[in-house]
């Protein structure tokens, strides 16, 4: 006998089934790729894309939305784009580009997206932070009053750099710009300053050599290397500087000191020009886009010395009473010494001073090839170590007078005694400012050398023996006056007792003639 269902049971059953149906609506913004060329994708139908948003493409590929037009979005692909095709689906993610940050990046080599490329396995525990961030406001900043020792006599004496400063290193190719930056990184190994070295558009072999040199000098442990090699896309070369800055800001925000080197911003500007032209943005001077100044200003303004209140607010009270700093050393390559080109003038106007390296000086054997006349540090003077500040005034004057007189001396047949003495002193100062690569010099040894030349102790030393004399003098002091050297290195102070000790022991050393 067939089972009969009454109408009420049927309606109850239907009601139960309807209640059990799970309908989950998902809102997704999708578009279609209409063209792919030279790393640029054009996407039709993405109505709600944001400027700088990550766009998801097939095979876990991402693009960065840069052009928001009326009916399409122009985006630059981060990585390989050979597998992308017209008609592919593109989705908005609602996120802007972020990179990993944290102490586990120290000692590692990563690409522009923060992925390790050194073969040492995955990164340790990290957080992520956006690559683009608004620079700290005026209220949160503090004046620069602590030094960053580069280990170079010529820089620390005449063009001092402070923590939180932006100091440009500018010069033609092969004048020692990268060498100066790497030596500065090596000099920070006992100072607690964390370093970030961003290599933009360099050969992979060059970056490998730099990493090896940092390892040999025990400097890789406090350094993050961000590499966007010449073989990588223009998008990654453009982003790498901002990614490196974000990694450096992690330390600044937590009341620590960090140093970042951008090597070099000329190549970043070229990469950005390439992207802009491919996106059909109108070209300006030297075919650069109109916002190339903003490209560098928004990057370099993120370098700052921030107040205790900023650090306390950022860490939500975990870190108190500590200031943080991010010091930037951007590098710019000039063509035939032309500092009046578009990008060099932009960066000179943004930074707090520049170290100008000259080809003629480099070829003459004066290395580092610093042109003391047009190199300047606008804020570093207030951060200079007391002893170096006291002694270095004479160095600049001696060099300036020497350069001026040397030009006249070529035409003069006979020189008076005063002029001849100034020329001879200038020759010895110039010789003393020479320094080999990877030979960082402590504050005490710099002070000793500067004091010796200022007080005329090198006047009777032949010019070709000046560096030998200096080396022997440092060895003599480290053997006989190690307590004095340690005291100066620790405090950086200058007083009558130190002056008397310098005078007495330099005179003693000269009588031995051991140089």
Curated annotation (Swiss-Prot):
Topology relative to the membrane: Peripheral membrane protein
Residues binding ATP: 171-178
Site (Required for activity) residue list: 375
Subcellular location: Cell inner membrane
GO molecular function: ADP binding; ATP binding; proton-transporting ATP synthase activity, rotational mechanism
Main location group: membrane
Gene Ontology CC: one annotated term: plasma membrane
Keyword terms of this UniProt record: ATP synthesis, ATP-binding, Cell inner membrane, Cell membrane, CF(1), Hydrogen ion transport, Ion transport, Membrane, Nucleotide-binding, Translocase, Transport
EC number: 7.1.2.2
Keyword hit for Ribosomal protein: no
Keyword flag Translocase: yes
PROSITE patterns xrefs: ATPASE_ALPHA_BETA
Record's catalysed reaction(s): ATP + H2O + 4 H(+)(in) = ADP + phosphate + 5 H(+)(out)
Any Pfam family: ATP-synt_ab_N
Physiological role: Produces ATP from ADP in the presence of a proton gradient across the membrane. The alpha chain is a regulatory subunit.
Family named by the database record: Belongs to the ATPase alpha/beta chains family.
Subunit structure: F-type ATPases have 2 components, CF(1) - the catalytic core - and CF(0) - the membrane proton channel. CF(1) has five subunits: alpha(3), beta(3), gamma(1), delta(1), epsilon(1). CF(0) has three main subunits: a(1), b(2) and c(9-12). The alpha and beta chains form an alternating ring which encloses part of the gamma chain. CF(1) is attached to CF(0) by a central stalk formed by the gamma and epsilon chains, while a peripheral stalk is formed by the delta and b chains.
Protein name: ATP synthase subunit alpha
Species, as recorded: Xylella fastidiosa (strain 9a5c)
